[in-house]
Amino acid sequence: MRRPFHTPPPVYDPARGLLHSDHFQIGYVTNDLDRAVDIFRTQFRIEKFRANDAEMPGGTKISTRTVWIGSTMYEIACGSGPGMEAFSKYAPPDGEFVLKLHHFGYLVPDEEAWQAMEREVARGGWQMYMSNDTPGYVKACFVEVPEIGHLVEFILPREMLIERFNATPVA
């Protein structure tokens, strides 16, 4: 179906404001990944997900399930252990079942735009979480934005993450 209205092209200018980047992802957080995936399968008829699971030293774990629905990537994330507070703060591993909106994901096209985003975060007085820069994979961070009630994630994808995104199933 073609949209019956004009959709502007993505904006890539975080220097204009924190949300002036290409919004491509909706992220959910959970403390029970199997149960959350089952909800997406039974309630929303999403059959296939790309699974990514990582365990690190010290008991840190992160698991995600991703799928493209139209031009939006949906992500369900479950993180626990040291360094995963950006997830466990919103879905405590030992708490009651949680599945809720966690973040909007924004693509950052290049290092210049990344630096503009960092300046905007500093200007706004927001807190940055889990900032990482993995050569060949991704430069990413979460920013806590209490004014809108959820985190925003900024992603500057590199070759390996681009391959992973391209291999993500389409619902």
Model-derived segments and spans:
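Vicinal oxygen chelate
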Residues: 1-17, 23-31, 65-70, 75, 89-113, 116-171
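N-terminal strand-loop-strand beta-hairpin
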Residues: 3-6, 12, 22-27, 43-69, ...
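A cross-kingdom feature marking solvent-exposed beta-strand/loop segments within repeated
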Residues: 10-13, 46-62, 83-102, 124-129, ...
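Histidine- and/or cysteine-centered catalytic micro-motif in compact active-site loops
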Residues: 79-81, 109
